[in-house]
Regions:
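Flexible, acidic/Gly-rich N-terminal and inter-domain linker regions that tether
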Residues: 1-62
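Short amphipathic alpha-helical segments, especially helix-boundary/capping motifs
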Residues: 9-14, 41, 63-67, 95-99, ...
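Residue-identity detector for glycine
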Residues: 17, 24-25, 34, 45-47, ...
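Active-site cofactor/substrate anionic-group-binding motifs, chiefly glycine-
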Residues: 42-96
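Core AdoMet radical
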Residues: 71-86, 93-114, 119-161
Length: 161
């Protein structure tokens, strides 16, 4: 098994059969995790990156059964942060040392492209040294492009089943 781990580490490629052997077989966990840790350190180092998550809304048009903010959950106390509330969270986060803000929420039609782009621009204008990540569910390609043009740095699109 160490031979497969070593080959995966050095060549970064195994056949499907070899991967299945590795996943399903008996192996030295300490050796495997040590190799994985070397790869992690090589590409990501040992730094810790803090991100300020701002849950902007728990309204969602979807009804995913596993999700607490699903449309049909009548026990959820719904909220939607105003633009001023969101910008205030960024102010507080900046004071605390955060340099990435993640605006996250359900698929809430209230937050149109115009509203999001205006907020992104305000955040980037006030805090040009900060990154803005969005996680607001599925949107159109045009919507993603508009938000990127407004200054968004990343979009976290979750695909859960």
């Amino acid at each position: 098994m160490k031979e497969l781990i070593d080959r995966l580490y050095s060549a970064r490629d195994l056949s499907d059969g070899e991967l299945l052997t590795l996943i399903g077989g008996e192996y030295d966990e300490k050796y495997l995790f040590g190799s994985a840790d070397k790869v992690r350190r090589k590409y990501y180092g040992t730094g810790v990156y803090l991100r300020g998550l701002i849950e902007i809304s728990n309204y969602c048009k979807n009804d995913c059964l596993y999700c607490g903010i699903r449309r049909s959950n009548d026990k959820a106390v719904r909220y939607r942060l105003s633009e001023n509330d969101i910008l205030s969270c960024c102010d507080n986060g900046y004071e605390l040392g955060f340099r990435t803000f993640v605006l996250q929420g359900g698929e809430d039609a209230y937050y149109t492209d115009d509203i999001m782009c205006r907020m992104i621009k305000k955040i980037k204008d006030k805090y040009p040294d900060c990154a803005v990540t969005l996680s607001l569910g599925e949107r159109s390609l045009e919507s993603y492009k508009k938000m990127f043009s407004a200054g968004a740095d990343r979009y976290l699109l979750r695909h859960e089943t």
